[in-house]
Amino acid sequence: MNIHEYQAKHILSRFGVSVPKGAIVHSLSEVDDAISKLHSKVIVVKAQIHAGGRGKAGGVVVCRTSDEAKASIKNMLGSTLVTHQTSKDGQKVRKVYLEEGCDIKKEYYISAIVNRKQSQVSIIFSTEGGVDIEEVASTSPEKVIVCNIDPLFGFQSFHGRNLCFDSNLSLDQTRKISDIAEKIYKVMLSTDANQVEINPLVETSSGNFIALDAKINFDDNALYRHPDIQELRDYDEEIKEEIEASKYGLNYIKMDGNIGCMVNGAGLAMATMDIIKYYGAEPANFLDVGGGASQKTVTEAFKIILSDKVDGILVNIFGGIMRCDIIANGIIAAIEEIRINVPLVVRLSGTNFELGKKLLDDSSLNIITANDLSEAAYNIVNIVKK
C-alpha cells in the first residue's frame, strides 16, 4: 500500500526525522488558512499523487509570494499529471501540499528496503540525491552504498559508519546520517513497510539534515496489524478494478495490453503473460484467482476483465486441489450470467481436465479449448489479430 508524501513525512517525524513544516489543501477554500500556518517567504506547492516524477511534470512549484502560491494551487487542483510512473492517462490531483522553502546546501539519497534475496533490510545511501537512484547506480555505481542489516542483531553504529566511509563526509555529517539511517530502519520494522525512501535528504547551510521528499510503501499482508496505517489509504489513487478484485480475494493488476488473462497461481499467471508476449501480443492484466476459486469468484473475475477494453480472454487453469470440472462449470455459469462478446480461449490441465474440457466443448457456448498453454496463447493472439 502506498501513501502520500505528506503522510510519509508525518510518520518520519514521529520517529525523529526532521521534515519541513507543511499544510495539506483539498480545496481552494483552505488555501488562506494553510498559507497562514507557514512562516517562510518561499512556499513550495506539491501535487499529492501516488507517483514519482512530479517535478518534471509540473507537479512541484516553488513560489516566492502568497499570490504565486495561490495561483499555482488553483492551476494544480483538479489537473491531471502525467509522469513516467503514471499511465498515459495520468493521475488527477485531488490535494496539494504546501511546504516551507528550504535552504539547500547538498542533496543526498537514503532508503531502507526489504532485501528478499538476503532476508534482510538493506539501507541504501548516496551522496547523489534528488535524482532516480537507478540512474545513479547505472552511471556512477561507486556512489551507491548498500548496507545489509541482519534482523537478528538490528541496526548497529558500525552500519552507519559503513554507509558514509567512502563518501568524504565529516564526523558530524556521518553521525547525523547514521542517526537518520537508524530511524528509517525503525520505521521499517515498526510499520511493516517494504520501502522507506528519502530523496532528497538535504543538508542545510546550518548543517541540519531534512527529509525534503519521502515515500513509504507498506506490506498489504501486514496491514491488519496497523489499523492506523490502513486509515491512510487513498482509494482515489488506486485502480478501481484492483480495489474491486481485492473484495473477492482476487489478485489483479491492470496493464496496457488487449488480451485479458484469468489464471490460478502467480507463477502460472506470469508464464501466461510471457507467452502472450512471445506470440506478439500484450496482456491486459495479471489476474490470479487463487487455489479455491468458486463460480462466484470466476464470474467476478470475468466482470473485472471485461470492465477494461480487451479484445480477447485467455483462461489458463491448472487443477490441483481445485478440480477442472468444477472450474469448467464455473466458467459456463459465469458466461451464461454475463454475456462475453470477445473471443475466449480456455486451457485446462490437471485433475479431471478431460471432463472439464468435455463440459466446455459440449456447452454450445462460444468457447475455444486448447490442449496446452502454447496452443492456447497462439490461438487467442491470432484470433485477436484478425
UniProtKB/Swiss-Prot annotation:
- List, for all copies, the residue spans of the domain called ATP-grasp: 9-244
One of its Pfam families is: ATP-grasp_2
The reply to whether Iron-sulfur figures as a keyword in the UniProt entry is: no
Source superkingdom? Bacteria
Give the EC number(s) listed in the UniProt record. 6.2.1.5
Which SUPFAM superfamilies does the record cross-reference, listed alphabetically? Answer: Glutathione synthetase ATP-binding domain-like, Succinyl-CoA synthetase domains
InterPro entries assigned: ATP-grasp, ATP-grasp_succ-CoA_synth-type, ATP_grasp_subdomain_1, Succ-CoA_synthase_bsu_CS, SUCC_ACL_C, Succ_CoA_ligase-like_bsu, Succinyl-CoA_synth-like
The record's cofactor note says: Binds 1 Mg(2+) ion per subunit.
User: What is its cofactor?
Assistant: Mg(2+)
Q: Write out the residues that bind ATP.
A: 46, 53-55, 99, 102, 107
Q: Which residues bind Mg(2+)?
A: 199, 213
What chemistry does it catalyse, as a reaction equation? Answer: succinate + ATP + CoA = succinyl-CoA + ADP + phosphate; GTP + succinate + CoA = succinyl-CoA + GDP + phosphate
- Give the enzyme class: ligase
**GO biological process entries:** succinyl-CoA metabolic process; tricarboxylic acid cycle
- Please provide, in alphabetical order, the Gene Ontology terms of the cellular component aspect for this entry: cytosol; succinate-CoA ligase complex
Query: Which pathway does this polypeptide act in?
Result: Carbohydrate metabolism; tricarboxylic acid cycle; succinate from succinyl-CoA (ligase route): step 1/1
The GO molecular function terms of this record are: ATP binding; magnesium ion binding; succinate-CoA ligase (ADP-forming) activity; succinate-CoA ligase (GDP-forming) activity
Q: Does the keyword ATP-binding apply?
A: yes
Give the protein's biological function: Succinyl-CoA synthetase functions in the citric acid cycle (TCA), coupling the hydrolysis of succinyl-CoA to the synthesis of either ATP or GTP and thus represents the only step of substrate-level phosphorylation in the TCA. The beta subunit provides nucleotide specificity of the enzyme and binds the substrate succinate, while the binding sites for coenzyme A and phosphate are found in the alpha subunit.
Q: Which HAMAP family match?
A: Succ_CoA_beta (MF_00558)
NCBIfam families in the record? PRK00696.1, sucCoAbeta
Summarize the subunit comment. Heterotetramer of two alpha and two beta subunits.
PANTHER family given in the database record: SUCCINATE--COA LIGASE [GDP-FORMING] SUBUNIT BETA, MITOCHONDRIAL (PTHR11815:SF10), SUCCINYL-COA SYNTHETASE BETA CHAIN (PTHR11815)
Q: What protein name does the entry list? A: Succinate--CoA ligase [ADP-forming] subunit beta
Gene it is expressed from: sucC
